[in-house]
Amino acid sequence: EIKYLFVKKSHLIREIKVALPSKKSYEIALKKHSSSSFAEKIGIPVPKTFRVNDKKELDDIVSELSYPVVVKGERGDSSSHVRYAHDFDQLKRSFDEVFQLEKNIESASLPPMIQEYIGGPTYLTQALSQNGKVKIIVPHYKFREWPITGGVSSRAKTIIEPRLVEYMTRMLESLDWHGEAGMEWKYDKNRDDFFFLEMNPRFEGSLDLAVKSNVNFPSLLIDLMDDKNISDDLIYSPSVHYRWLFRYDFRCFLHNEFGISTLLMESIDPRINGELSIEDLGLLRCFWKSPFNEITNFIRRSN
């Protein structure tokens, strides 16, 4: 994991190159408690958040809660440490469950936080910064995600959204960020604003979409590690569609997130990019079993 580079980098072979922010900034970004507090401090909208020291203190905030609420741990990938509670009993159970998951992670030290639920839709921004200056931000809209309650993009498109760019720029420059980063957002139509959910100090799972929109983040990161000056004139292509059918979206289909007609129409829509194109037919042998395995596992879980 990246955190070990901060511990070991002074002992690494001199020729090994990295592109990292400061250890303090990295730890703020890594932990959801810290990144949410930091975003709020610099004026970025965040969901209403309650922080308690243990389950007993949930009684102190019960009158202030409006269900559903989100129980969110410090860590956890792809929303694995996130639960949704629709009443107080479920909140207590979810708190215990997430807290137990957190105890299995060395760097997680705080109890779960309770957040206001914002229905969405969900947006994601990917960026690269050099010595505190943002070089490029690529925002995208999530049509679908896996798990369907919130997670990795499974069908998305790049968009133009100045507010997301402004919020992410403010966050990264306030952290004096160096390297790649991603941030997730929810849009609340009643307040007509975007709310910060979390920051990932790494490449996002939806990296393919950014690359397809003409921003090759891995190549730019290599340039960053080589101490090359990154251009201020990088431009991404908006309205680029992408679907991660084999990895995620077929699971959404199996869980009735969309129907067979959508599956077929999106499969033949030339505007929608994916893991494979006609030029990649030679790679199909690596993927063709995946949907069948998903169907088999789905049937087994249903029985």
Where are these regions (language model features)?
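Phosphate-binding site of ATP-dependent enzymes
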Residues: R93-P147, A156-M171, Y187, F194-F195
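Glycine-rich phosphate/pyrophosphate-binding beta-alpha loops
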Residues: S79, F143-P147, S153-R155, N200-N214
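Conserved N-proximal alpha/beta basic substrate-recognition cap immediately N-terminal to
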Residues: E1-R51
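Flexible, glycine/charged-enriched surface loops at secondary-structure junctions
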Residues: A108-S109, M113, H178-G182, S231-S237
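ATP-grasp fold ATP-binding core
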Residues: A39, E64-Y84, N104-G120, I137-P139
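Glycine-rich phosphate-binding loop of ATP-grasp-fold ATP-dependent ligases
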Residues: V46-R51, V69-E97, T122-Q126, E145-A156
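Peripheral (often C-terminal) accessory segments that flank ATP-dependent C-N-forming ligase machineries
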Residues: L58-I61, D223-N303
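Conserved metal-phosphate-binding beta-hairpin within the catalytic cores
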Residues: E173-L209
